[in-house]
Amino acid sequence: MAFKDNAVELEERVVAINRVTKVVKGGRRLRFAALVVVGDRNGRVGFGTGKAQEVPEAIRKAVEAAKKNMVEVPMVGTTIPHEVRSEFGGAKVLLKPAVEGAGVAAGGAVRAVIELAGVADITSKSLGSNTPINIVRATVEGLKQLKRAEEVAALRGISVSDLA
């Protein structure tokens, strides 16, 4: 789901910049690919990729793509509602809620997504491939799977107190 209101100030973080080449008859064509995560630190986060001949232009394109690719992250206090595992390509990510004050125990690309989503207390583990784009996609996929207790109760047709 895309969010159209640009009134909210979004923070952006460049996760990776790669130099990519296309081999043509006359030699190599050099371009830059950027992976950027944007978020409002209040439950909304997105990522995007951009490619251009100059790094700043690639980053600008990635930011525009990220703004069109925002997801809502349900939170319980400063953490996530429940444990979740997700995969994308060869990358596997495990996200676990943590007690208040524990901080963000996550590395690299996962940390960027989690911090910009506004989650203050979480534990994560990246397994399998450590390619930044696949790690980011797996993390966002995991955040999409999260559901609050009220949503689960409504889906099952029972009250929240019966959810034990």
UniProtKB/Swiss-Prot annotation:
Pfam families: Ribosomal_S5, Ribosomal_S5_C. Signal peptide: none annotated. GO terms for cellular component: small ribosomal subunit. Residues 10-73 form the S5 DRBM domain. GO terms for biological process: translation. One of its GO terms (molecular function) is rRNA binding. Keywords: Ribonucleoprotein, Ribosomal protein, RNA-binding, rRNA-binding. InterPro entries: Ribosomal_Su5_D2-typ_SF, Ribosomal_uS5, Ribosomal_uS5_bac-type, Ribosomal_uS5_C, Ribosomal_uS5_N, Ribosomal_uS5_N_CS, Ribsml_uS5_D2-typ_fold_subgr. The N-terminal domain interacts with the head of the 30S subunit; the C-terminal domain interacts with the body and contacts protein S4. The interaction surface between S4 and S5 is involved in control of translational fidelity. NCBIfam families: rpsE_bact. Part of the 30S ribosomal subunit. Contacts proteins S4 and S8. Belongs to the universal ribosomal protein uS5 family. With S4 and S12 plays an important role in translational accuracy. Located at the back of the 30S subunit body where it stabilizes the conformation of the head with respect to the body. This is Small ribosomal subunit protein uS5. It comes from Streptococcus agalactiae serotype V (strain ATCC BAA-611 / 2603 V/R).
